[in-house]
């Protein structure tokens, strides 16, 4: 089943996108900072969410990991 139609898979993809963008921005900030608008601006926005809401994103990742490992 596609991640678009399964809510848990969609949340997993969004969390992975946020975490990956925040990690890439911590390694090479200029890579994401030059595209703040347009289609590629989504990655910059995900990186900002990952930086500013870091504790909440971490808790969501842990909860998602436990739900995938133990509830399926």
From Swiss-Prot:
Residues 1-26 form the signal peptide. Residues 72 are cytoplasmic. InterPro entries: KISH_domain (IPR051523), Ksh1 (IPR009653). One of its GO terms (biological process) is constitutive secretory pathway. The keyword Translocase does not apply. Keywords: Glycoprotein, Golgi apparatus, Membrane, Signal, Transmembrane, Transmembrane helix. Residues 27-53 are extracellular. It is found in: Golgi apparatus membrane. One of its GO terms (cellular component) is Golgi membrane. Its main location: Golgi. Belongs to the KISH family. This is Protein kish-A.
């Amino acid at each position: 089943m596609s991640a678009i139609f399964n809510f848990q898979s969609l949340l997993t993809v969004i969390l992975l996108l946020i975490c990956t963008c925040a990690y890439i921005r911590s390694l090479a900030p200029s890579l994401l900072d030059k595209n703040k608008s347009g289609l590629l601006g989504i990655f910059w926005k995900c990186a900002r969410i990952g930086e500013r809401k870091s504790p909440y994103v971490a808790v969501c990742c842990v909860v998602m990991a436990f739900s995938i490992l133990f509830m399926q």
